[in-house]
Swiss-Prot record:
ATP binds at G90, S91, V92, A93, V94, G95, K96, S97. One of its GO terms (molecular function) is ATP binding. It catalyses: (R)-pantothenate + ATP = (R)-4'-phosphopantothenate + ADP + H(+). This is Pantothenate kinase. Gene3D superfamilies: P-loop containing nucleotide triphosphate hydrolases (3.40.50.300). Pathway: Cofactor biosynthesis; coenzyme A biosynthesis; CoA from (R)-pantothenate: step 1/5. It comes from the Bacteria. Its EC number is 2.7.1.33. Belongs to the prokaryotic pantothenate kinase family. Keywords: ATP-binding, Coenzyme A biosynthesis, Cytoplasm, Kinase, Nucleotide-binding, Transferase. GO terms for biological process: coenzyme A biosynthetic process. CDD domains: PanK (cd02025). It is found in: Cytoplasm.
Length: 306
């Protein structure tokens, strides 16, 4: 399906002409600090794509605050508004994590740090490896059944119920497992939730994650490009982070490059690629906005729900 009928289409050249102050732009040093491995996001992308997008999100945020205030005044209630939740979805290796960090830094800048902006990844809501192994679904890590959906639903419910302190589970890409410790969020104003599964719906669940989101973004690219980026990132990690003997993937530094390539291709063809086609890509049209990347990593097209 390729149904963008209910979206406005902005080619890059049109989107970049949207008026916005350049005062909020990031520096090269700030961008370098948050850029992910093998993610080629540039200051040009920040200026031409993300700055107009952040302004759009700010407009939506202020509109939500205004509507809530009007409603509370009419109902004669004094309850503050629940956090404004931004969802960011897309495949493994498409650049979600860097984009989420860009969102956080630019929203902090936009609101001059007068709003508390938090970033949460859904990796923390995976079942621990021990549970996945017990259930025989370690090779389905990242698929819908590998997530603790009850825990994720409680997290979202706590946020929207305006609970003062909300527990956030943590995940380590180094050990490739959920950590025992958690962190607490205290009264956030804006929460960015990033993960491959955030827009997925389970017909057997009474609550859909998307019910809780105020704005949602899907990072899109052609599968062949994403596969190439995944392989490039794998080999970069093989030369860096995987070299640490404590890394879950350290054994793959001890085999030949050809064997490592066979392993990485196998992971894509049997896990990540399958998950993209069966579960992730179909959520694209649930997003309020789709960012499409070209082969060069630059965002070429923006689709905004009408």
């Amino acid at each position: 399906m390729n149904d963008y009928n209910h979206y406005f289409h902005f080619p890059r050249e049109e989107w970049r002409k949207l008026e916005v102050s350049k005062d909020q732009i990031l520096t090269a040093e700030e961008l370098e600090e948050i850029r992910g491995l093998n993610d080629r996001i540039s200051l040009q992308d920040i200026s031409e794509i993300y700055l107009p997008l952040i302004k759009l999100i700010a407009i939506q945020y202020h509109e939500a605050i205004f509507i809530h205030g009007e409603k509370m005044e009419y109902l004669k209630k004094k309850e503050s508004r629940a956090p404004f939740i931004i969802a960011l979805a897309g495949s493994v290796a498409v650049g979600k994590s860097t984009t989420a960090r860009v969102f956080k830094l630019m929203l902090d800048r936009w609101f001059s740090k007068t709003r508390q902006v938090e970033l949460v990844t859904t990796d923390g809501f995976l079942y621990p490896n021990k549970v996945l192994e017990e259930r025989g679904i370690m090779d389905k890590k990242g698929f819908p059944e590998s997530y603790d959906r009850d825990r994720f639903a409680k997290f979202l419910t706590d946020l929207k119920a305006n609970k003062e302190d909300v527990e956030v589970p943590l995940y380590s890409h180094f050990t490739y497992d959920v950590l025992d410790e958690t962190r607490m969020m205290h009264n956030p104003d804006i929460v960015i939730i990033e993960g491959i599964n955030v827009l997925q719906a389970d017909q057997h669940e009474s609550l859909y994650p998307s019910d809780f989101f105020d704005f949602s973004v899907y990072m899109d690219a052609n599968e062949a490009d994403i596969k190439n980026w995944y392989l490039e990132r794998f080999f970069m990690l093989r030369e860096t982070a995987f070299q640490d003997e404590s890394s879950y993937f350290h054994p793959y530094t001890k085999i030949s490059k050809k064997e490592a390539e066979t392993f990485a291709l196998g992971v894509w063809d049997t896990i990540n690629g399958v998950n993209l086609k069966e579960n992730i890509e179909k959520t694209k049209y649930r997003a309020d906005l789709v960012l499409h990347k070209g082969t060069d990593h630059l965002i070429s097209d923006i689709y905004l729900r009408k």
